[in-house]
Structure formats: structure tokens, C-alpha cells
From Swiss-Prot:
It catalyses: O-phospho-L-seryl-[protein] + H2O = L-seryl-[protein] + phosphate; O-phospho-L-threonyl-[protein] + H2O = L-threonyl-[protein] + phosphate. Enzyme with a broad specificity. This is Protein phosphatase 2C. Monomer. Belongs to the PP2C family. Pfam families: PP2C. Keywords: Hydrolase, Magnesium, Manganese, Metal-binding, Protein phosphatase. SMART domains: PP2Cc. Residues 23-274 form the PPM-type phosphatase domain. It comes from Leishmania chagasi. Gene3D superfamilies: PPM-type phosphatase domain (3.60.40.10). Mn(2+) 1 binds at D55, G56. GO terms for molecular function: metal ion binding; protein serine/threonine phosphatase activity.
Amino acid sequence: MGIPLPKPVMTQLQERYGNAIFRCGSNCVNGYRETMEDAHLTYLTDSWGFFGVFDGHVNDQCSQYLERAWRSAIEKESIPMTDERMKELALRIDQEWMDSGREGGSTGTFFVALKEGNKVHLQVGNVGDSRVVACIDGVCVPLTEDHKPNNEGERQRIENCAGRVENNRVDGSLAVSRAFGDREYKLGSGSQLEQKVIALADVQHKDFTFDSNDFVLLCCDGVFEGNFPNEEVVAYVKQQLETCNDLAEVAGRVCEEAIERGSRDNISCMIVQFKDGSDYAAEPHTTVVPGPFSAPRNSGFRKAYESMADKGNTTVGALLERRYDTLKAAEALTPEETEELSQFENGPEAKLTGAERQKWFSNYFQKLCEAASNGPSDQMERLQSLQQQAGIPLSILLSLMGEQTQ
């Protein structure tokens, strides 16, 4: 994972999809990571839908591949499909990634939802430690189980394949026992299911009542990484839905709450309701909400901030302009927001409008990038952030890191 950024990148990528039987909102934030490696998929038809969240590691290549591969696969499938067919698809998609020779890996959790009368039937697949968690009649109902190396059956397979479980990780490194990709754990002489790490999906089923207050969450493990267990996530969403009907906005609040509770990972949250979502069908699918530009002199933070703009199909100049205007229009600012606004100095001249005004913000960002290198300063900021998380004096942390490099 590396040393975390000194401040989280909280730019939100909101997505809204809907039709006559589904209403779906999702959100993701980069958080403290150097790169955003999550991906997700919503595919709707008049009678069924497919929903998935993919949490990449090493890079974002495998998670992005899974989004495309599952879309391509599901477009050709007859629904309903058997459990064996869902497992076959997962294994085939994994093998195609392996055959490509590319590096990286990803977890994947997904479900097919099929409307039958006044019921919606879910067929849930899971590979890894992302989760599907439902709220049924107000009660939290987990629909997946994390695939962790210390689970007895997983440990036995890993050890049978000449692997080891150390610190609850495969060979002391990988935190999940099932994943797509991760070729270094799939080089044994056995079959696709006789490897340290496999992409065999567990499949479960659950029925929901159409047009009820039930909902389903698909979340990467970053949501739960801090002190935010399933039951509290569901309770939090229920509470937010009492005053906010925008699922993408509520999903964003889940991401923010996860950061507040200690998560240092990328965070993705999708909320699905089984009711008329025609209002979402008419809206732009993607909205980018700029987060605080709170560490402008840190190169890692700037890179991650710009990357989130790219993923939202916008520019960092446009993002900073919107953030600046939001701060200027606020009736009151927190001390942190006041400091953030001051970093723009006097801002653009009043006479600048349109593309010229946006260019001012692009130039401001470029000047920060071209400033004299402050690499040591970057590193110290991030070390201080790591020290705060570890809860030990910085001098001891530096000493321990020095011992590990000897």
C-alpha cells in the first residue's frame, strides 16, 4: 500500500442509473491512497440488472478489465443463469486475464437481480473481500463472506499448493485468498482451482419485495476497513435515506464516514433499490464533486487529485474552479476551508470568464507542479501521517523503517 497521502483526496465520482424497476446510485473516493484502483458496473434491462464492484490491487488494470469483461459477458447471457454458469464465467474471465500476461489483481462482488411478479430475486457472486450487504425489513443481512487466507478451507488449499499463511496473508503478502489476476499466486502445476489464490465465486440467493424500503449495498473492503461494521453501515444508510432521496449522495456520505472512522483505502459504495428509478434514467449518469484541495504542495496528493479529475472525464482546472467557487460562495468557512481558500491567493481576475477563467486554475495547478522539488517535504508529511496512524513516536518509526531496509 505504501505510505499514505498526508490528506485524503475526497473528490467524488457520483453515478446514477435507473429504469422502471431499479434505482441505483454509486460513489467512490480516492482517500489516502496514491491511486484509485476501484471500478464498478451497472447494467440494466427491462426485467433484470447486473451490479458489480471490483477492488483492484497493485494497479487499476485488472479492476478496469473486470468492468469491461463482465459487461461483455452479461450482454450475451440468458437470464436467469445457473450457479454453475456464474462460476464458469468468473473462472473464464480470470483465465482470459491470465492469458493476457498483464500484472495486477482485483476482488469482485456482483449480483444479478431478476424481477418476477412482486419479487426481485438476487443471485450473488463473490470473489475476495468486497461485500454485498442487504437491508431487509430494516434488518442487516450479509449476502457474502470474505475470502481470507486464515479461513480454514482457504488455508488448507493454500498450504496444499506449497503456500503459507503468514500474518493472515498469502505468503505473507496478499490479504485475500480468492481474487481475479494475481498471477504470481497461480503458477502451480495444478488446475485453475488448485492454486494458492483462485477466482471461484461463492454464490448465494435472496428474495426481495419490489417497491419496498429494502436496499442492497455493494462495497469494497475500504468501507469496512476502519471501525464501520456491516450493521453500522446499514444503519447509517437507513438514517441518511430518511432525509435524502439521492442514492449517489448517500453513497458519498458512506465514503466520507468510512474515512472519518479510520479507513485509509480507496472507497466505493453502490446502493440499489428495487423500485421505479425513472428519475435517474433522465439525468446525466456521472457527476464529479470536487473535494478539498488540502495538500497542494504535496506531489502525491496533486497527482491523485488530477487522476480523479481524469476518471471523471474532466480537467483539474475545471475541478479547482468549481472548488474555489464553492468556497467563495459559502456563508461560513471552517478553519481548514479558510486555509484552503487562502492558497488560491487572490484568485482569478474578475474580468476572466469561461475558458480563460478555467485556464487560470489550470495554470495555478501547473505552477505548483513546476515549483522547486520538495520531495523530502512530501516524504516527511506522509511519514507524519503514518506515524499518527501507528500511534508511536516518529523517531521510533524511522528507526524501525531503517532496520527493515538493512
